[in-house]
Amino acid sequence: MEKGTLLEYRLNGDRRLAVADRPDGKKNWVVVDENGQANSIPPRQIAYEIGGGSYKPSDIPNFRKEVEKYLDPDSLEVAWEILVEENRGVDPGEMAMLLFSENEAPNRYASYLLLSEDKLYFKQKGDRYEPRSATQVAELKHQQEVETHRQQEWGNFVARVQQRLAGELVEWENTDRIRIEALEKYAALAEEARERNHAKETLSSLGRTDTPQAAFKLLVELKVWSEHENLVLRRTQIPIHFSTKVLEVSQRCLNFPPPDLDANNRLDLTHLKVYTIDDESTLEIDDGVSLEYLEDGRQRLWIHIADPTRLLSPGDELDLEARRRSTTVYLPTGMVPMFPHDLATGPMSLVQSQLCAALSFSVILEESGAVTEYSIHVSTIKPTYRLTYDDVDEMLQLGLQAEPEISAIAAWSKRRHAWRVSQGAITISMPDSSIKVDENEEITIRLLEDCPSRQLVAEMMILAGELGARYAQTHNIPVPFRGQPQPELPPEEELLILSPGPVRSSAIRRCMPKSEMATTPSRHASLGLDAYIQVTSPIRRYSDLLAHFQIKAHLRGDPLPLAVLEVQEIVQSIGMAVREASLVERQTNRYWILEYLRRHSGEVWQAVVLRWLREDENLGLILLEDIGIELAWRFPRAVSLGDRLDLQVAYADPREDQIHFQEMVYQTAQL
């Protein structure tokens, strides 16, 4: 290379034009750019020697302007068509002759720039450039089009994000939803999310940190999620929505109900007065009760259970969907149903004043509460009253002469409870609460009283479960029996030391084994029954629905739809789903409890020390009596079981699942 040679070199990846000035050592050259800046560069930094005479640094601006006149990337396509036909490569000088019919320095450098920046038509081999095949060019064009389209989509997405962050309403495109769903998965599942890299790329491109917390914050700012989004639910496999196919099947079922297999066997019980008793907010009404006066002076109790299997067949679309869900999930913000809403609250429910299909349990009791005789029937009923628990409590308190049946049913429920206690039933009376969150995210926690109406319903449902179990056991029908091993309770003298009420009940409760499901009957210790199944919530629990399928098939003399092994497999699968649903319910309730307490941090709560969790660490369980909520707390001083404390929330963060209390200490004024 000689002094005055015009060349291109690279500095930090950028193209620079300079003129060779002098050698620097054995290999390097000092070059000077148009601004007079001198740099010593090794040969490897020199990208292209333009040549064409002796140049001065001041010539560079005019040279660059001259080159720019020839920089038309579209001209390469014409050259490529010629060269691919001839199957030959070119260097920049030859390309200059082909494109511009001359090989002067500006033409040559323009050709070099076009070739070196081209990613479509040519590939470099040494100092020459070979034409790609037509197939390769077509594929690269397709890739470029895809990338251009992707960049356009990204630009549009960013624009919509900025609009939404500014408070404007936007309509998300399908491609936007893919990005948003990736953010949702990442916010909920963190590094376990398969979409995490996609989400991180989106966050980084928007100038945000690529953490799950940042994804959550962005979703809240975009109003895609609430500040109180249920991450516990989103981390599970619980399906929140029904598929289009299931909804279509549900609608067909509503419009064109299938033939009733039990039409000829349904007992007409529309003459009976039927009471359905639920919370005011309950929409899936799956049980009702009646009392019938017999000619011999005895009274017959009827427990009517909704008959959703009237609309289903084992293994059909709706049945399999219900089996997959296994249970309705009840959350403070609403429920995730087992069946589509219109079906569950419509023809499946026991709706007031409408003809309803039911599975009715008839029973005559001894004065002691023991079962004298019973029968089970598919039936048609017409619910008379849709009552709340408060309604029934008021009716019982007033002793309405117009409704003697409800008082009689309540009296029988007390006898039933006494009989179960005589059979070894274990009564645990602990405060319970209802937690509701409305559409404005206002939280209400209501203490549920252990009132006569709730006792009435509970005893009637337990009675139906006993009758269903007796029938299945007598006729060798495989159903999901529920059992509970006998607990080892603390000695009587140890229990008597504890304060009566929640403290004593808590000591008993901690000794109770979990109930178990199996296809063979076993004793249920806490209920005091030798055999028991759940049959009273077939709209909300798949185990109940399964029992209905089996019992109804036997009643009409058909083969059982499910053999023992099939029932066992289903019991195992729904058991896992129910445990997951229970965990979601518990953790979601806890979240809203902590949020409620955070919002009421100025209030003083009366608490009782229930039991020790780790006494050596002063960690125990407390009960906030006003709202019936149990929480763990590490006591800052020595306390005893049953002690009452006045507490105030010192710190609460429901998202981090943390709450700390401080005890209020009152000083007595000295006279």
Name the predicted role of every residue range.
Residues Y112-L113, E117-Q152, R194, H228-V232:
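Charged low-complexity interaction tracts in eukaryotic proteins
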Residues G167-L267, H271-K273:
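Low-complexity, highly charged intrinsically disordered N-terminal segments
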Residues D21:
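Electropositive, intrinsically flexible nucleic-acid-contacting patches
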Residues S40, E49-N62:
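Compositionally biased alpha-helical segments
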